[in-house]
């Protein structure tokens, strides 16, 4: 078995049928599908049982509430593939998703192959001149700190052995952010293919946005210990995250709390010409105080 496709399902996902059909439509054939469901409705469980009964590729796991574990970890425990990928139950993948990712994984002996995802925007042209970027060893973490590589777990193929001694945290808010930099640390070769292969259903998430800044500080400690030469890049990344989170948080006092992180790390970002103009403008506005930045973020959303 080459690839295990893990679909973690929380609650009643209305697009699961569409998701599974896109997975079963792959042109690459050597794969299995593991559907892990938590708190599934009766109809959801019936649907998953139907899929498992009628397609030998599919394994259905009905998680009970007392099993305090991330659904992705449960899928990984059952996975038989040399490689794994994760698909959210509201999303769909291109029919050649596995074909492209496996080609680049085997061509470059890569442990991670990453592609692009899109939401509700129609793609008129999926052809890009610079077709692939290959990062090796410490280049991987550097480019993650430089924000050339993203922290999303979706739209990627992983060598399953990367997850030896690495698990997703039980708390599923920002579990990807808290895990991906640890995988990048273990990865020797990462290929970024500039193709849109994954459709992400746009929906409003009820995230605890403030918790992410705490996880950023957790990441800072990791970088300080293992990649001290990248510490300033990490501080730029945290400054940008804090500004982004300010645009998401409704409570004014919470935005003020995030602004303290902007003040703490903005000196590392203020002259960083890699940053998009909009982000640099926000960093500059922060020098004029919280009220100015807060207002500027609202009018430039």
Each PLM stretch: what is its role?
Residues 195-233, 241, 252-269:
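Catalytic core of nucleotide-sugar-dependent glycosyltransferases
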Residues 20-62:
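Acidic donor-binding segment of Leloir-type glycosyltransferases
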Residues 252-301:
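Membrane-interface aromatic/basic loop that binds lipid-linked glycans or pyrophosphate carriers
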Residues 2-15, 19, 26, 36:
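A conserved hydrophobic helix/loop-capping motif in glycosyltransferases and polysaccharide synthases
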Residues 68-69, 91-193, 200-208:
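Donor-binding/catalytic cores of nucleotide-activated saccharide
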Residues 84:
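Short aromatic/hydrophobic "clamp" motif used to bind/position activated sugar donors
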Residues 1-4, 32, 178:
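Cell-envelope/extracellular polymer assembly enzymes that use nucleotide-activated donors
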Residues 63-79, 89:
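Glycine-rich, basic loop-to-helix element that forms the pyrophosphate-binding segment
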């Amino acid at each position: 078995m080459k690839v295990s496709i893990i679909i973690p399902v929380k609650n009643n996902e209305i697009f699961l049928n569409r998701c599974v059909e896109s997975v079963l439509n792959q042109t690459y054939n050597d794969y299995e599908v593991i559907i892990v469901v938590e708190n599934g409705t009766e109809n959801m469980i019936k649907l998953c049982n139907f899929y498992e009964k009628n397609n030998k590729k599919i394994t259905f796991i009905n998680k009970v509430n007392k099993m305090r574990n991330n659904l992705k970890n449960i899928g990984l425990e059952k996975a038989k593939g040399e490689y794994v990928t994760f698909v959210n139950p509201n999303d769909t993948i291109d029919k050649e998703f596995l074909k492209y990712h496996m080609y680049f994984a085997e061509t470059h002996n890569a442990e991670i192959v990453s592609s692009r995802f899109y939401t509700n925007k129609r793609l008129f042209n999926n052809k890009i001149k610079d077709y692939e970027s290959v990062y090796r060893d410490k280049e991987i973490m550097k480019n993650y700190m430089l924000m050339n590589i993203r922290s999303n777990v979706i739209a990627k193929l992983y060598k399953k052995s990367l997850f030896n001694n690495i698990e997703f945290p039980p708390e599923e808010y920002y579990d990807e952010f808290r895990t991906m930099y640890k995988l990048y640390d273990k990865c020797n070769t990462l290929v970024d293919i500039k193709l849109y292969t994954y459709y992400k259903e746009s929906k409003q998430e009820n995230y605890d946005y403030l918790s992410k800044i705490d996880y950023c500080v957790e990441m800072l400690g990791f970088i300080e210990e293992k990649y001290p030469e990248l510490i300033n890049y990490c501080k730029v990344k945290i400054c940008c995250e804090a500004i982004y989170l300010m645009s998401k948080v409704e409570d004014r006092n919470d935005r003020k709390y995030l602004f303290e992180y902007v003040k703490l790390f903005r000196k590392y970002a203020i002259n960083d010409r890699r940053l998009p103009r909009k982000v640099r403008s926000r960093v500059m506005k922060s020098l004029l105080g919280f009220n100015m930045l807060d207002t500027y973020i609202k009018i430039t959303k």
